[in-house]
Amino acid sequence: MAAAVSTVGAINRAPLSLNGSGSGAVSAPASTFLGKKVVTVSRFAQSNKKSNGSFKVLAVKEDKQTDGDRWRGLAYDTSDDQQDITRGKGMVDSVFQAPMGTGTHHAVLSSYEYVSQGLRQYNLDNMMDGFYIAPAFMDKLVVHITKNFLTLPNIKVPLILGIWGGKGQGKSFQCELVMAKMGINPIMMSAGELESGNAGEPAKLIRQRYREAADLIKKGKMCCLFINDLDAGAGRMGGTTQYTVNNQMVNATLMNIADNPTNVQLPGMYNKEENARVPIICTGNDFSTLYAPLIRDGRMEKFYWAPTREDRIGVCKGIFRTDKIKDEDIVTLVDQFPGQSIDFFGALRARVYDDEVRKFVESLGVEKIGKRLVNSREGPPVFEQPEMTYEKLMEYGNMLVMEQENVKRVQLAETYLSQAALGDANADAIGRGTFYGKGAQQVNLPVPEGCTDPVAENFDPTARSDDGTCVYNF
């Protein structure tokens, strides 16, 4: 204990020289409590000398700040330093903090926003502007487009994706939704552009459109070539269609592009510089009508699109999203028409507006429709959204189905060739009792009834409908 006391008492009591009273820097007292490290104190640490400089406050003119200022980005800095300034506000002495809201001390993001954006998780959302995208459709299209922009080792990726299926199932519209969600502005082509009066023009057009898309990709914008209804323009629909040289050249051009996607040349020129690879998306109803070597697996990846019940319900919810129809009514409506295409429900919704249009025509007059709609100083007419109910949709849906049945049942072309009669053209109207005694007018005009037989004694020449009252004198 004595040794400990003597050690504690052995403190260097040399006077500490400050303010220039000693020579140089001196050592601070050291003890076992402070350790053996020597701490040097500057001789000018507490100088009473005052500065002769003046303090100036300057205002920066915003109009003189240029876009080329090397420090202008600091005002929008969202690094961790800026967040620390925000978090430390109110927790640190104000002496050590710069005023908030001045230049770089203004944090653009709050701490919560910064953390939430940093930890944000992205998922494959299958909605675009309120419209439903089928997950299987979106998966196939996104994977195909992405795969064509990647460099996969020792793998030959098919350039063309052929989406085919029944009519009116939303193939083209679903493609547009997926591309819009991916930020792609595609180069569009239709089946009508695959035929021309000049031999070779459609094949040249395909190469031009492909190179246009390649130029956009070269500029840093994702793009693709989208061909609508390929089978209608390049396929053979039976003996009634003629196979022309343009059909042959379109098939050959697509085959050549699929084999050499980075070396697509225009007729009459050759450029050694390679172009960007552009994925091609094709839609159609029946790809069995296309040239078989074109649709082989190495060139075209095929996808048969048949929407499930969930897909049909999801698309119909997007169609009727602004009509305040209950979800259970939409499900029932879809189940009531299981064999109809998705396009049927879009036509059904448009059919409900017929009543509003009819009221507009009656209020304006048939003679004034042209001046009101085509050459009018007034704006376009505004219609109130009609009330849509399940009962009204079912009524119009049954009417559309009846028209479809008429087309399949009557087949007037064959009837005209076989006989000089109308066949069963009016069978549906006769069965409903709406054929006799009524004309084709849209308004209820009185039809005079009476005896229409000239041989009868009570023949009425003004009668337009026979009521069965003819009297004969034998």
Curated annotation (Swiss-Prot):
Location in or out of the cell: Plastid, Chloroplast stroma; Plastid, Chloroplast, Plastoglobule
Source organism, top-level taxon: Eukaryota
Keyword terms, alphabetized: ATP-binding, Chloroplast, Nucleotide-binding, Phosphoprotein, Plastid, Transit peptide
GO MF entry, a single one: enzyme regulator activity
GO cellular component, one term: plastoglobule
UniProt-annotated binding residues for ATP: 165-172
Transit peptide: 1-58
GO biological process, alphabetically ordered: leaf senescence; response to cold; response to jasmonic acid; response to light stimulus
Phosphothreonine found at: 78, 283
Post-translational modification: Phosphorylated at Thr-78 by CK2.
Family affiliation: Belongs to the RuBisCO activase family.
Described function: Activation of RuBisCO (ribulose-1,5-bisphosphate carboxylase/oxygenase; EC 4.1.1.39) involves the ATP-dependent carboxylation of the epsilon-amino group of lysine leading to a carbamate structure.
Protein's name in the database: Ribulose bisphosphate carboxylase/oxygenase activase, chloroplastic
Origin species: Arabidopsis thaliana
